[in-house]
């Protein structure tokens, strides 16, 4: 049976992505990430329990909540010391929220690559959706993330990236006999783009920052921590 690591927040997007992969024959391993700006991480396990009850322990595994604060700090360190003029001159205009989301998502992906190598998993799934108005969930960025995973012989899947209608999203649960109400964690940093924002400008800046500043850091971080089990709690 093929194995897939699922970035699982307990929300509807990650839950539906999990269901779709189970239906495709995957054994799924759910992992939740905490960047230390999360509330309600305990809620995530409730979503796992619902999936386990419906699909069985053999198909659904739960890895728990893993701390990515250290990786996140390494990625944001240089950028947080830049003046606004340096950011604009070197990368273009970007909102603070979209940079935070870019660095956080990349931290999740770096940790996912490490976990996949440790557990011999060849697939990762993320519930990213174009319609959510995050720069990192647009096709231009998703394709770059696919390239990153390919370097490590891992395929990242975005099962619902083209799903635009939240009404249809809920129906996907209902037709499977699942109530579309969920318990999920809440990130305090994640703020989607305003519909009136010049999102192409921010998207292009996100791409520049990823390629020039963040991507060069990924392999050194992976090599440094590849044999370390990610932390569950801080002592």
Describe the residue ranges of each PLM region.
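Nucleotide-activated chemistry modules centered on ATP-dependent adenylation/adenylyltransferase
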Residues: 1-235
């Amino acid at each position: 049976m093929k194995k897939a690591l699922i970035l699982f927040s307990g929300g509807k997007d990650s839950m539906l992505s999990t269901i779709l992969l189970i239906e495709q024959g995957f054994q799924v391993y759910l992992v939740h990430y905490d960047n230390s700006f999360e509330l309600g991480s305990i809620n995530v396990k409730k979503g796992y329990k619902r999936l386990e009850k419906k699909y069985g322990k053999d198909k659904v595994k739960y890895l728990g909540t893993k701390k990515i604060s250290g990786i996140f700090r390494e990625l944001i360190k240089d950028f947080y010391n830049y003046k606004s003029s340096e950011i604009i001159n070197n990368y273009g205009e970007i909102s603070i929220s979209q940079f935070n989301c870019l660095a956080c998502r990349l931290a999740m992906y770096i940790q996912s690559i490490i976990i996949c190598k440790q557990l011999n998993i060849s697939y990762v799934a993320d519930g990213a959706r174009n319609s959510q108005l995050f720069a990192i969930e647009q096709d231009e960025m998703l394709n770059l993330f696919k390239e990153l995973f390919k370097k490590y012989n891992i395929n990242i899947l975005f099962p619902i990236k083209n799903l635009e209608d939240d009404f249809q999203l809920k129906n996907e649960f209902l037709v499977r006999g699942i109530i579309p109400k969920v318990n999920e964690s809440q990130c305090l940093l994640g703020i989607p783009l305003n519909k009136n924002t010049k999102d192409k400008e921010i998207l292009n800046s996100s791409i520049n920052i990823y390629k020039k500043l963040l991507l060069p850091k990924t392999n050194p971080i992976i090599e440094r921590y590849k044999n370390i089990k990610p932390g569950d709690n801080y002592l």
